[in-house]
Amino acid sequence: MHFLSPAKLNLFLQILGRREDDFHEIVTRYQAIAFGDQLSLSISSRDSLQVINACHLETPSNSIWKSVALFRRYTGITTPVSWRVVKQIPVGAGLAGGSSNAATALFALNQIFKTGLSDEEMRSLAEQIGMDTPFFFSTGAALGVARGEKIIALEESVSDRYVLYFSSEGVLTSRAFAVVQPSDCSSRKNLEYTQNDLEKPVFRLRLDLKEKKHWLESLWAELPVHIGLTGSGATLFVRYPEILEEDPSYAAQIQRAVTLSGGLLTSPIRRDPTAWYSIYSESALAAT
């Protein structure tokens, strides 16, 4: 069985302060995108994991094995399984690659063993894995509150396009939050729905990302776009309304900017509650 394990963007992320448990209270807008890893699952004689493009992730601590352990504990099914992941999402990119793999693995196990777990049951298991893992059991658009793990599904669809800019070096989420200062946080009464409060602390750690954002701002200056950091980085992204592409003049400028900057153009993706995210056909995935 083959599945898309999609990346996500934080279209905004605001920090409301530090909680009593020493985590930070946040509100964020998650959006799944039509870019991600390819995950395959089969029943086997022994447990195994192969990760193409990132063999260093073939370890017992991989988030996929966390999903397997939770699923087995919850269902009592212990049949060995074999995983193959074609890794496209960079590590430490702010795109939730590990969380997406974990969520996709839970869904895949539910499918292959026909256990009939509801989204709510899988979301509850996902909360034990990572803060943004439960998001993937939404329709692909949601608010994340508390530490980001409490999901409020959004039904409206967005007609945006995104251009992604990766970094050769990732940013640890824990490190980014560790350097957050009170002045970086937002007021509950003054939320800005394009702002990422982690930008300032991350840019203090990574001057190269700050400079890269300034370069992108100059490159895209003639277009009505938003440029920001997703999560704790290190991925920067450009966001613009898809309708711009219907104007030949804007379309040409967009194409030029994407080409000159070497960005990856992608779109939002939604999930049918009865299925999983998909931008590939089953036959196309099987051929990889």
Swiss-Prot record:
Pfam families: GHMP_kinases_N
Gene3D superfamilies hit by this protein: 3.30.230.10, GHMP kinase, C-terminal domain
Active site: K8, D132
Enzyme kind, highest EC tier: transferase
Domain of life: Bacteria
Keyword Nucleotide-binding: yes
Residues bound to ATP: P90, V91, G92, A93, G94, L95, A96, G97, G98, S99, S100
Keyword line: ATP-binding, Isoprene biosynthesis, Kinase, Nucleotide-binding, Transferase
GO BP terms, alphabetized: isopentenyl diphosphate biosynthetic process, methylerythritol 4-phosphate pathway; terpenoid biosynthetic process
GO molecular function annotation: 4-(cytidine 5'-diphospho)-2-C-methyl-D-erythritol kinase activity; ATP binding
Function, as annotated: Catalyzes the phosphorylation of the position 2 hydroxy group of 4-diphosphocytidyl-2C-methyl-D-erythritol.
Family the UniProt entry places it in: Belongs to the GHMP kinase family. IspE subfamily.
UniProt-recorded name of the protein: 4-diphosphocytidyl-2-C-methyl-D-erythritol kinase
Gene responsible for this protein: ispE
